Amino acid sequence: MAKIVDIKGREVLDSRGNPTVEADVILEGGIVGSACAPSGASTGSREALELRDGDKSRYLGKGVLKAVANINGPIRDLLLGKDATDQQALDRAMIELDGTENKAKLGANAILAVSLAAAKAAAQAKGVPLYAHIADLNGTPGVYSMPVPMMNIINGGEHADNNVDIQEFMVQPVGAKNFADALRMGAEIFHHLKAVLKARGLNTAVGDEGGFAPNLASNEDALAAIAEAVANAGYKLGDDVTLALDCASSEFFKDGKYDLEGEGKVFDAAGFADYLAGLTQRYPIISIEDGMDESDWAGWKVLTDKIGAKVQLVGDDLFVTNTKILKRGIDEKIGNSILIKFNQIGSLTETLEAIQMAKAAGFTAVISHRSGETEDSTIADLAVGTAAGQIKTGSLCRSDRVSKYNQLLRIEEQLGGKAPYKGRAEFRG
């Protein structure tokens, strides 16, 4: 038994300079597992609650001392003496103690930090890497794959102070022979994109996730700049590299319309579905996240019927890593993929349940960071340990993003051929 003898919480900073929660779970024998909770900017209304203090005299009200106190008090008291390797029992106990639908009492940030720290401590106690422990918890021991990275190299929307409405423009090195090759390709494209933007006299400052954040004439202008960078890097768009979008449509859905302020265009759901379909015809876009508002299920149905057979349609704000909401999407044939974010649901156990439900229904599962991140690289191990096949963890700069890529390099080196990189086969169409 990997007996928990102490739990400690603390307030640390995320990549935006805002407080977040870190937890240590300490086992008999001195083993320590540590984990941080991430934080989002464009958040779904149905996400589990991130508990913040609201005290304007500290960190502009964003302090997390209440969540930390919950770790050091009731959560610690609850879990002392328990077995860290029994992840389900730990998570269920915390969920039951909280007693709310959205973890509003203890805070999803408090519960998640402890949940992940316990998993890390348990992996050490077993003498295995974290990804191997996660595979065991997932019921798929020894089954691994290296994820295709979806690299966010132009930022807009809530992730940047520019006029671009679509939040993320991503490249996917689907033609790479392994993850290390994919990372190199992405980095080369990133540097060529900087040169393309500089040549156009555009800003090359980066946004929250490390992508460039220039003002552009249109969303399509961003795609054209990326296409030029891909070609300049010596790769063939559509073969070596494909494209993906995160529209984060809930951020520009106003009064029942999709309002692209940067382009001066307003669409109803059918019109916006046509707009997105047009982009997929002109560019090799094989994945679109949050193409409709989180509450516009009718719009999602229109989009799914129009392009869902050939394009991965990912629900982020729509599904919020929640199996109850995902089940509705599966039953109604809304979308065909789920974005997986630990802190939307607030525990490792519930995260694994969402991945399992998605895969059983033929949906893909994309493991994702948040725009407010730390050096914690747990999502890299989650992607490999669940053989999810895809990961979103930002651009090719900022160590809060690169820490995940570097962990994936280490894992690929450890596993060798036991973790295949499947490239284009991970996607639809």
From Swiss-Prot:
Compartments, record wording: Cytoplasm; Secreted; Cell surface
- Primary location: cytoplasm
Keywords assigned: Cytoplasm, Glycolysis, Lyase, Magnesium, Metal-binding, Secreted
Q: Which InterPro entries match?
A: Enolase, Enolase-like_C_sf, Enolase-like_N, Enolase_C, Enolase_CS, Enolase_N
Which cofactors are named for this entry? Mg(2+)
> Which E.C. number(s) belong to this protein?
4.2.1.11
Q: Name one GO biological process term.
A: glycolytic process
Its subunit composition reads:
Component of the RNA degradosome, a multiprotein complex involved in RNA processing and mRNA degradation.
Name assigned to this protein: Enolase
